[in-house]
């Protein structure tokens, strides 16, 4: 028998009592802890990035960093670490953060490092991902080349009527609220955070799907068509599921993804394909002369149908569906949130707001909303927008990773396949590039000889350290359209209404998930008409 031998008795003793007189599970725990301690020691002292400063404890556990990420407060944590360690630090050994302007331009523009895999987790399928979520540089290059004409100056002008129509509905709703008030000149409260989010989605509905989502109308009219009323919630759920799946790898392939947002958007894309194919079949050789709706969806549908079947890079209907949904992700709350934050900054700086009002002529509430090509030159408004984008970038960081080869950043060798994030927020608040970085100071974006700079001259902005739309080949392709939208909405609002603060500054908090957003989805302002209502 085995137990009668010396070896057999030893095995039996280990089974019964464990090694060193301890239970087996306790020995396994000790072994795990020792192994973890060794890995932490190796990461902290022996890794190729060991000379880069950073929190020591994160080499043994990333739980604190994960806690901040899950709560959406990692941006604040990263800011504090940049203040402590400077323009370059590491979280553990595989995550680097950099806030130096030259280093960021090196990573984003010169080397054009690929995005981290977190972006791919946001896509429905990485094989058909759009420009925002793809991590494949070659695929992105081909899609960028395809999409660029749809965001060129001339094409953007063709989209102006859709932008005007959606904006008109918002300000008609505001006008109706004023008319219903018992005292038109008693301040009314507008939750601009949600109002502007609805406006941005309506604009994207018009330009990317050919219909208005009618979200603005749903806020004031109980009888409005509410078919798309939940699209913001469905989009948020879609993104939330993608983020969760990223942290559950490799089991993410067994997790079901919420794709209900596609149930709303796919029929719109399919209908446009059917219309275009039928129109082309009926028109024959004269198809090019048939009038069509000139929007982004039509551009993509035409491009898809015109691509040769034998091409290696195809633009299928699935590609178009995914790209249109990604336009909602990248162009929705990014613009609307920025407008809200600019209003917040102006209300916290009454002298700047008063100065801005001096440059904008008042308008009646029932005037037609001017298109962005009809707006007058507004240098001080432009400076206020730029300063707002500096202080409130749409994302606190841009995640990239090194490829198969190492790269050198600020004299440090970064090994292959290491995540390295460009800290845009830390860059925009660096006293190295910005005098009084915590001060809202629009004059820094004006020429020194500008009449608007005379009363409060500021050091000139360092435009190389100003990256609200990113930089390099993967910068925001819709930056011109977003700029026009911000100017148009802000000019119309301030021309018609006098705004005043309602929210206490210390009660407004932020979260960073996909974009920089308010912790509580509400920012109210008080408004009164600048001109008397017509009888």
Swiss-Prot record:
GO terms for cellular component: membrane. It is an enzyme of class 1 (oxidoreductase). Cytochrome P450 monooxygenase; part of the gene cluster that mediates the biosynthesis of the glycolipid biosurfactant ustilagic acid (UA). UA is a secreted cellobiose glycolipid that is toxic for many microorganisms and confers biocontrol activity to U.maydis. UA consists of 15,16-dihydroxypalmitic or 2,15,16-trihydroxypalmitic acid, which is O-glycosidically linked to cellobiose at its terminal hydroxyl group. In addition, the cellobiose moiety is acetylated and acylated with a short-chain hydroxy fatty acid. Induction: Expression is strongly induced under conditions of nitrogen starvation. Expression is positively regulated by the cluster-specific transcription factor rua1 that recognizes and binds to the specific 5'-T/G-G/T-C-G-C-A-T-A/T-C/T-C/T-G/A-3' upstream activating sequence found in all promoters of the UA biosynthesis genes. Glycans are attached at residue 3. This is Cytochrome P450 monooxygenase cayp2. Belongs to the cytochrome P450 family. It is a single-pass membrane protein. The lineage of its organism: Eukaryota, Fungi, Dikarya, Basidiomycota, Ustilaginomycotina. It comes from Mycosarcoma maydis. Its main location: membrane. Its cofactor is heme. GO terms for molecular function: heme binding; iron ion binding; monooxygenase activity; oxidoreductase activity, acting on paired donors, with incorporation or reduction of molecular oxygen. Its EC number is 1.-.-.-. Keywords: Glycoprotein, Heme, Iron, Membrane, Metal-binding, Monooxygenase, Oxidoreductase, Transmembrane, Transmembrane helix. Heme binds at residue 476. Pathway: Secondary metabolite biosynthesis. The chain crosses the membrane at residues 19-41. It comes from the Eukaryota. It is found in: Membrane.
């Amino acid at each position: 028998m085995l137990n009668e031998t010396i070896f057999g008795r030893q095995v039996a003793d280990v089974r019964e009592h464990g090694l060193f007189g301890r239970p087996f599970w306790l020995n396994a725990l000790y072994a795990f802890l020792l192994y973890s301690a060794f890995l932490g020691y190796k990461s902290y002292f022996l890794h190729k990035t060991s000379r880069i400063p950073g929190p020591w404890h994160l080499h043994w556990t990333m739980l604190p960093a994960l806690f901040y990420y899950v709560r959406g407060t990692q941006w604040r944590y990263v800011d504090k670490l940049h203040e402590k360690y400077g323009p370059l630090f590491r979280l553990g050994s595989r995550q680097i953060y950099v806030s130096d302007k030259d280093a960021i331009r090196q990573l984003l523009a010169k080397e054009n490092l690929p995005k981290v895999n977190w972006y791919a987790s946001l896509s429905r399928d990485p094989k058909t991902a759009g420009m925002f979520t793809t991590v494949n540089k070659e695929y992105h290059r081909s899609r960028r080349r395809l999409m660029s004409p749809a965001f060129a100056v001339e094409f953007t002008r063709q989209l102006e009527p859709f932008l005007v129509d959606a904006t008109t509905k918002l300000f008609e709703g505001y006008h109706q609220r004023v008319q219903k008030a018992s005292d038109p000149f008693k301040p009314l409260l507008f939750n601009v955070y949600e109002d502007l989010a609805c406006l941005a989605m309506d604009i994207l509905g018009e330009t990317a799907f050919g219909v208005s989502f009618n979200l603005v109308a749903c806020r004031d009219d109980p009888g409005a068509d509410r078919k798309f009323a939940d699209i913001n919630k469905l989009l948020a759920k879609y993104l939330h599921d993608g983020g969760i799946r990223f942290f559950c790898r490799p089991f993410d392939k067994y997790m079901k993804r919420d794709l209900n947002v596609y149930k709303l958007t796919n029929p719109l894309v399919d209908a446009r394909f059917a219309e275009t194919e039928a129109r082309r079949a009926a028109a024959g050789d004269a198809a090019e002369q048939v009038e069509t709706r000139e929007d982004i969806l039509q551009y993509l549908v035409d491009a898809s149908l015109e691509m040769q079947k034998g091409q290696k890079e195809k633009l299928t209907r699935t590609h178009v569906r995914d790209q249109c949904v990604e336009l909602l992700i990248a162009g929705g709350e990014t613009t609307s949130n920025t407008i809200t934050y600019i209003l917040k900054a102006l209300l916290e700086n009454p002298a700047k707001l008063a100065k801005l009002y001096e440059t904008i002529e008042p308008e009646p509430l029932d005037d037609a909303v001017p298109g962005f090509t009809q707006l007058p030159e507004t240098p001080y408004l432009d400076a206020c927008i730029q300063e707002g984008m500096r202080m409130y970038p749409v994302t606190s960081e841009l995640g990239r990773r090194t490829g198969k080869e190492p790269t050198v950043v600020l004299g440090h060798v970064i090994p292959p396949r290491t995540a390295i994030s460009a800290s845009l927020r830390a860059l925009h608040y660096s006293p190295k590039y910005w005098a009084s970085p915590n001060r809202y100071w629009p004059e820094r974006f004006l020429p020194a000889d500008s009449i608007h700079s005379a009363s409060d001259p500021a050091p000139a902005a360092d435009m190389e350290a100003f990256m609200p739309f990113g930089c390099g080949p993967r910068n925001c392709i819709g930056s011109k359209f977003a700029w026009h939208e911000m100017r148009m909405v802000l000019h119309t609002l301030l021309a018609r209404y006098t705004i005043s603060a309602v929210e206490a500054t210390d009660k407004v908090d932020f979260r960073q998930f996909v974009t920089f957003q308010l912790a509580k989805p509400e920012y109210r302002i008080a408004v009164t008409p600048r001109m008397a209502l017509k009888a």
